[in-house]
Amino acid sequence: MASILRSVATTSAVVAAASAIPIAIAFSSSSSSSSTNPKSQSLNFSFLSRSSPRLLGLSRSFVSSPMATALTSDRNLHQEDRAMPQLLTEFMVDMTCEGCVNAVKNKLETIEGIEKVEVDLSNQVVRILGSSPVKAMTQALEQTGRKARLIGQGVPQDFLVSAAVAEFKGPDIFGVVRFAQVSMELARIEANFTGLSPGTHSWCINEYGDLTNGAASTGSLYNPFQDQTGTEPLGDLGTLEADKNGEAFYSGKKEKLKVADLIGRAVVVYKTDDNKSGPGLTAAVIARSAGVGENYKKLCSCDGTVIWEATNSDFVASKV
C-alpha cells in the first residue's frame, strides 16, 4: 500500500518564463475557450510518460519551433507580472462519463491562476496548467463530489528529480511540504500545516534527514553557498504564519534551489520566528515524489488496494 499512497498523497514545481514554453505549447487547448475555435488542436498527453522516448524529443522540438519562438516573446511579457510561475499538475479523479468531465472542467476553470484544463476520461486523469496552489485545486475537485488524488506535479522536462515531498505525521503537528523544479535555477514550494501554535514560526531545510532525536539530529541549516558572503542561506525558507486554529499555508518560490539536492535532507519547523539554531519543533525527511506522467497506477502492488478504496486515514491527516 505504501508505494501507491506515498506517491499519490505527496506528489507536488514552478515554471520560469524560459521553461514555460514546452508546457504551454504541449498543453491541450481543451478548455471552454478553445472549443470556440475550430482550428484549435488537442494533443494527447501520453507522451508525458517517463517511459516514453518521445518526452524529451517533443520538448526539444517545441522549443526550437517557430511557434515556440512566438510564444516565448508573449510569455516573457506576462510572466514578469505573475507572482508564481506555472506548473503542470495531475490529479486522478473518479470520473465515469462526459458529464463528470464537464463538471470537473467547469469547476476548475473558475479558479484564479488556472490557464488550461485537460481531462483524460479513459485514464481518469485531469491535467491542469497554471499557478494556482494544489490546495485550491484539490478543494475545487472535492466540491464536484468526486474522489480525487494528486498524482504528479512539475514540468515535462528531463530533470533528474522534478518533485519532492516532506510529510509531517504528528502526533501533534501534521502537514505536507511539496517541492517542484520549474527550471534549473528555480523551484516552487507549497506547504500546509495543522496543529501549530498560533503565530509566526521560522522554518528551513536542514542538512540531514536523521530523525533519531527528532529535529535536534537534523544538523545545521542547509547552505551549499556558505563560502559566498552576503548571500541568504539556501535552506532558509522564511516564516510560516499560523492562524488561531493552528493552520498555516505557504506558497512561494526559491531561486537556485535544486530539488534533486534536497532528497534525504529534512524540513524543520521552529517554535518562534527567529531561532533556527535551536532543536526545532518538528521535522520531516524530504523524499522523492512523482513528477508529470510518472504515476498512473490505480492498483497498489503491495496489497491490491484500488486507489478509490483508500480512506482519508491512509493519507496525511492534514488539510492539504
Curated annotation (Swiss-Prot):
Domain HMA: 86-149
Amino acids binding Cu cation 1: C97, C100
Cellular compartment(s): Plastid, Chloroplast; Cytoplasm, Cytosol
Residues that hold Cu cation 2 according to the record: C300, C302
Deletion consequences: No visible phenotype under normal growth conditions, but mutant plants have increased tolerance to heat stress.
Requisite cofactors: Cu(2+)
Protein's recorded name: Copper chaperone for superoxide dismutase, chloroplastic/cytosolic
Species of provenance: Arabidopsis thaliana (Mouse-ear cress)
